[in-house]
């Protein structure tokens, strides 16, 4: 009888495991109402300029980076945005780093960005550091569009947000951006892109089952 009872318990655990793995939509439905939207950066108070740029070439080839009061997303009540202009003569890849990186101990599902572009052909990546302590480069968009556009990036399966050793909550750190220049630009051309309000969908981290040391993702 003990053997039969033990076998039944194992079978129940196996079924429960496969229900969890094969039916993520059930859990997603339960979790959908607990996400909240927070502002990561709205560019209303912080200053941005050459001090935020990290590039391999000399400062004389740095792009123009500044806060703009002219370019503002029509979707939100915005007064300022981050304006970046890259001329053909200064065509190079570079990083735009926050003076104070944004951090979150909550689980971050996605980031959303209100962006303007003039179809310049460059690409923009997010620079984040996850619980592995490695810096990750995540593709946000290719600048193959003109005008304003809301760009969302789901990072829930792209980075680790649980501590692999102690299983405690660990921070996700948003360091800034990496701009990758197009292979070539026509002489006299310029690429302009603007980043306005950056938002994140977050929820608390918690244990999956009592006594378990696995954080829900």
Segments (PLM) and residue ranges:
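Hydrophobic alpha-helical segments of integral membrane proteins
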Residues: 17-20
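Beta-rich carbohydrate-recognition modules and glycan-binding surfaces
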Residues: 28-217
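Proline-rich low-complexity regions
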Residues: 10-12, 108
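N-terminal secretory signal peptides that target proteins for export/translocation
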Residues: 1-10
């Amino acid at each position: 009888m003990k053997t039969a009872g033990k076998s039944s318990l194992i079978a129940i655990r196996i079924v429960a495991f496969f229900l969890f793995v094969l039916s993520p939509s059930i859990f997603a439905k339960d979790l959908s109402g607990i996400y909240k939207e927070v502002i990561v950066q709205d560019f209303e108070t912080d200053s941005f300029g050459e001090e935020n740029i990290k590039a391999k070439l000399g400062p004389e080839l740095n792009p123009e980076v500044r806060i703009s009061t002219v370019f503002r997303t029509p979707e939100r009540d915005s007064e300022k945005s981050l304006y970046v202009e890259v001329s053909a003569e200064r065509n190079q890849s570079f990083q735009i780093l926050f003076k104070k990186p944004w951090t979150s101990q909550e689980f971050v599902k996605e980031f959303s960005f209100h962006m303007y572009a003039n179809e310049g052909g460059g690409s923009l990546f997010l620079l984040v550091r996850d619980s592995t302590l490695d810096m990750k480069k995540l593709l946000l968009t290719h600048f193959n569009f003109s005008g304003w556009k809301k760009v969302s990036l789901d990072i829930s399966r792209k980075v680790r947000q649980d501590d692999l050793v102690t299983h405690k909550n660990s921070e996700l750190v948003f360091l800034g951006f990496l701009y990758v220049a197009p292979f070539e630009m026509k002489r006299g051309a310029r690429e302009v892109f603007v980043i306005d309000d950056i938002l994140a969908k977050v929820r608390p981290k918690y244990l999956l089952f009592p006594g378990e040391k696995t954080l829900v993702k």
